[in-house]
Amino acid sequence: MVKYLVGGMLFLIAISVSAQRITGTVNEQLAESKTLRPITGANVYWSGTSQAVSTDTAGKFSIPRITQSNLLVISFVGFRNDTVRVGAESELQVVLQNDQTLNEVTVRGNATTIDRLSPHQTEIITTRALAKAACCNLSESFETNASVSVSYSDAVTGAKQIQMLGLNGTYIQTNIENIPSIRGLASTFGLNFVPGTWIQSIDIGKGAGSVVNGYESMTGQINVELQKPDTREKLYLNTYINSFGRAETNLNLAHQLNEKWSTALLTHASALRSRIDQNKDGFLDLPLYTQYNVVNRWKYQSEKVMAQFGVKALYEDRLGGQKNFKSEMKGSDAVYGFGAKVNRYEFFSKVARLFPDKPYKGLGLIVNASLYDSKSYFGRSNYNGRQETLYGNLIYQSIIGNTNHTYKAGLSYLLDQYKERYRDMPLTRNESVPGAFFEYTYNHLDKFVLVGGGRVDFHNLYGTQWTPRLHLKYNLTDETTLRASVGKGFRVANPLAEYYGNLVSSRSVVFREQIRPEVSWNFGASVTQEFKLGEMDGNLIVDFYRTNFDNQLIADMEDPRYIVFYNLEGKAYANSFQAEANLTPLKRFELKLAYRLFDVKQTIRDMNNENVLLPRMMVSRDRVLFNAGYALPYDKWKFDATLQWNGKRRIPYMGPVSDHQHEASTMESTMSPSFYNLNAQVTRTFPKWDIYIGGENLTHFRQKDPIMNANYPFGENFDAGMAWGPVTGRMIYAGIRYKIIK
């Protein structure tokens, strides 16, 4: 029975009738099989009171009767609320209906949904959404999302990078099932290492995240949930091929061993073997590659214990550079080549102690160990990196008096061992960081929610770090929600891994000084307005966030001869404004229109060693996104199209070295043109399988000369790290999905 406190007399009355309980099960109905599936974590509460419980992993709940209300409200994100008038019955069976605004949600669609209950501004992307696009891996799941933009980091390696709130993905804490994963050396290719068919859902949170997950979140937090062993699909097969010659196969297998044990095997294999040079500059537009990726995971579920554990393994081999380059030519002075081999191994476990009679209470332990090993070369330059990581997080949660006041407290430990070498320059670093955290939540009937927390971490290299964060949510009306947040972030940068694409150049790498940790403060606010005009549903989301840096890693590429790393001296900030409208003018027809504005600046030293505040490189100031999606009845045919307009951005001066002045007037002058990009997909669904065909960059826009001085790759002006637009033109793809439901 969930504890509550509504006054002494009411408390005594509730205790006296505690034997009179309402129990039940909350389910959703699966469209494919018409069967019921339990909903875990649904909110069940008496209308107008703070008396509330949550459903367990079997969808079950138990709540005492009260005298103040006989209206029982059941709610869960992505489903329509259900209100049941309770009479003499004591056992309820509730089936929640999919909320239309979420039922059709897609990263490429117009109804990316804000979690209505969370004080964090959180967008939710579901499996159904991912199936509407090819989404071959995590990086491609954001290509049409208004908040997150994706681009290639250079014109040779094929590495992709994301931006949110005007800053690179390294400032976003990216977790896999609440375990920090795409960080450190893995930030180079990590987004490519999570196949789309493995993903169950993606949460995108703006602003500093929860202190429970660590101190590295600066502009946001992305959490990816993978397919679970007890998923409803015992077999899921996806095949994909595109006009560039890229092919991949994904196979997910899940098996329920008995009532408590289940297991799953997630596999992926992909390759690109076609040598493509559309712009005829003599370099491959995309690297050849082969990737093998597998996860074996297990789950144990009992009334009092839930445990998940498993292993991951990945191997990838990339080869790029000039079109006639072969791997045996590595180190050649005549032909420029790029190569990268990555091996990654990981063990993870999550164990939770449950308290069935006190669902608000829990104790969890997360343990993760990983090894990331990469060996790369860029022409005659070698770069090797190895990262060994051990992570542990012990979390206890409970209430203070009643469920209006909850808290999480715990201990964490992070061990990172880095061994890098670029040319003849070794970079070795061992970080050992024990920490403790506390986070308090006040929730008044989901109308006003306050989450305040702090953590203290004892870094062996950089001393004690204090990280406070605060999130607020207030519902002005049932249709209007305000959110605000402020928080500090702290991270240790890995310059070579984070600017990996810039190593494909003749630039000399210079560390002007010892690089200190990056420290920032992020604050922002948002308003979400739901509305209904006749038969048209919709919402409007407007937000503004600002990130101020106390210290930031500066990667100075103003001089085409160098990439110089040093600490911030002066100001650095990022302002982000976004307005997004989602409309459903007709049944199964969705429209989305979003505008985003970035104002991002940092202080750079000019040739006279004076500080100049300039717009940050490679950040588009403006972006407009328009999406239209339509589905025929029963989703037999689904159509989706997205048009993006990307505004101008400042790019480095790439003229002759003799003309370069490295002064403010020169640094301000070089801007890329704006461009449009169109993506579209059509899907035909059948009871057990889907067939889809689509295209990307249908406008066929390509950056002119993405590689500077491509004819002389060993000359002083060679640079492939200045890609600001698409390197390849129009791409057509097709695929098949097949599934067997348990």
Regions of interest found by a model, annotated:
Residues 443, 544-548, 567-656, 737-739:
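Gram-negative outer-membrane beta-barrel transporters
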Residues 645-659, 683-742:
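C-terminal beta-signal and adjacent terminal beta-strands/loops
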Residues 272-293, 299-363, 369-387:
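Flexible loop and strand-edge segments within Gram-negative outer membrane beta-barrel domains
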Residues 25-47, 75-79, 87-131, 139, ...:
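Short, acidic, small-residue-rich periplasmic hinge/interaction motif at the N-terminus
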Residues 364-376, 475, 483, 516-573:
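Membrane-embedded beta-barrel scaffold of Gram-negative outer-membrane proteins
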Residues 61-64, 179-206, 294, 512:
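Short acidic/polar hinge/loop motifs at secondary-structure boundaries
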Residues 64, 139-183:
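Extracytoplasmic beta-strand/coil segments of soluble accessory domains associated
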Residues 90-95, 138-141, 160-163, 175, ...:
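N-terminal periplasmic accessory domains that precede
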